[in-house]
């Protein structure tokens, strides 16, 4: 019988990252775990619908035995079974992030007995989680270089707080993992601005694009009007294509916040990324830790290691026989496997 791993949910960022990472790693390694103090660092601690959906999805995919899987629970026991490929559908029932549920279960399906399709309904444009276009255009091309083949499709947008979005991913078992080396991003090739609108006046998007264009030389400026029933909602994105990597940054519009202020938040984030020579942004760094650990080697550079990143590394090191090295040089942090 494999040893039970005990985790403290208040560790590090004190949010849902510990739980999501633990679920992924437990399914992959077969090691059971308990976690207490789930989301202890949040104003509303315990399992929300998004986290509960991730737990139930993980349990279904590997036929796990679970205790404490209920809304508001701050303690969970998860004893995994064998990961099975198949066609899965999960509904969050709120505007909780579809992509965070997918990111919990997809790594386990890299080790399944056959190809899978996972469809999740809920929120697709959520201020606290990467949107589907980030997964599709930034993360998945890098995963493909590592020998991981998955394809995400956004079937319907669902903006916070209403939800109603649908995202699906097709994924195949991984034959072998390749290492990823992302020490430098290289020169910028082009930058693309994009605005999504649903039930919001077009002039909002035009003002947001104008704000982006006032700070950056944009090779493309795209405005996409979605059906009104997918809103109301507004997301502004800026994609930075460099020689070695494409990064994508986003901000979700809010009621009573002007278009200029929304876009200015995005400008500030992109300028912070461009001010350093780091290849990887904050969100992407979180997502690369697990596949890099499974490959057993690789490296990337990030401007500042976030609390999410450090928490993720700590959980990975509890489940896998790897150790990460973080070395700061010339204003960037180089993250690698020792």
UniProtKB/Swiss-Prot annotation:
SUPFAM superfamilies: EPT/RTPC-like (SSF55205), RNA 3'-terminal phosphate cyclase, RPTC, insert domain (SSF52913). The active site is at 308 (tele-amp-histidine intermediate). One of its GO terms (biological process) is RNA processing. Keywords: ATP-binding, Cytoplasm, Ligase, Nucleotide-binding. It comes from the Bacteria. ATP binds at residues 103, 283-287. It catalyses: a 3'-end 3'-phospho-ribonucleotide-RNA + ATP = a 3'-end 2',3'-cyclophospho-ribonucleotide-RNA + AMP + diphosphate. Its EC number is 6.5.1.4. It is found in: Cytoplasm. GO terms for cellular component: cytoplasm. One of its GO terms (molecular function) is RNA-3'-phosphate cyclase activity. InterPro entries: RNA3'-term_phos_cycl_insert (IPR013791), RNA3'_phos_cyclase_dom (IPR023797), RNA3'_phos_cyclase_dom_sf (IPR037136), RNA3'_term_phos_cyc (IPR000228), RNA3'_term_phos_cyc_type_1 (IPR017770), RNA3'_term_phos_cycl-like_CS (IPR020719), RNA3'P_cycl/enolpyr_Trfase_a/b (IPR013792), RPTC_insert (IPR036553). Belongs to the RNA 3'-terminal cyclase family. Type 1 subfamily. Catalyzes the conversion of 3'-phosphate to a 2',3'-cyclic phosphodiester at the end of RNA. The mechanism of action of the enzyme occurs in 3 steps: (A) adenylation of the enzyme by ATP; (B) transfer of adenylate to an RNA-N3'P to produce RNA-N3'PP5'A; (C) and attack of the adjacent 2'-hydroxyl on the 3'-phosphorus in the diester linkage to produce the cyclic end product. The biological role of this enzyme is unknown but it is likely to function in some aspects of cellular RNA processing. PANTHER family: RNA 3' TERMINAL PHOSPHATE CYCLASE, RNA 3'-TERMINAL PHOSPHATE CYCLASE. This is RNA 3'-terminal phosphate cyclase.
């Amino acid at each position: 019988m494999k040893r039970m791993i005990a985790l403290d949910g208040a560790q590090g960022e004190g949010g849902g990252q510990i739980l999501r990472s633990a679920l992924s790693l437990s399914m992959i390694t077969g090691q059971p775990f308990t976690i207490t103090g789930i989301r202890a660092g949040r104003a509303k601690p315990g399992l929300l619908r998004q986290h509960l959906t991730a737990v139930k999805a993980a349990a279904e995919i590997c036929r796990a035995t679970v205790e404490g899987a209920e809304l508001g629970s701050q303690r969970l026991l998860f004893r995994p079974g064998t990961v099975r490929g198949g066609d899965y559908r999960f509904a969050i029932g709120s505007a909780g992030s579809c992509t965070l549920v997918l990111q919990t279960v997809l790594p386990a399906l890299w080790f399944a007995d056959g190809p899978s399709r996972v469809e999740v309904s809920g929120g697709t444009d959520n201020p606290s989680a990467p949107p589907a276009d980030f997964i599709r255009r930034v993360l998945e091309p890098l995963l493909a270089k590592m020998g991981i083949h998955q394809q995400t499709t956004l079937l319907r947008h669902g903006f916070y707080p209403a939800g109603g979005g649908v995202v699906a991913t097709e994924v195949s078992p991984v034959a072998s993992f390749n290492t990823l080396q992302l020490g430098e991003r290289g020169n910028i090739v082009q930058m693309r601005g994009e605005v999504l609108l649903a039930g919001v006046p077009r002039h909002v998007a035009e003002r947001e694009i104008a704000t982006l264009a006032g700070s950056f030389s944009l090779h493309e400026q795209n405005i996409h009007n979605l059906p009104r029933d997918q809103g109301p909602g507004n997301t502004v994105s800026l994609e930075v294509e460099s020689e070695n990597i494409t990064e994508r940054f986003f901000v979700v519009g809010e009621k009573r916040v002007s278009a200029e202020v929304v876009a200015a938040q995005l400008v500030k984030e992109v300028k912070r990324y461009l001010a350093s020579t780091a290849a990887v942004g904050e969100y992407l760094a979180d997502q690369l830790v697990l596949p890099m650990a499974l490959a057993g080697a690789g490296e990337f550079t990030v401007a500042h290691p976030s609390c999410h990143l450090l928490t993720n590394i700590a959980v990975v090191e509890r489940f896998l026989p790897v150790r990460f090295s973080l070395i700061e040089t010339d204003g960037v942090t180089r993250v690698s496997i020792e």
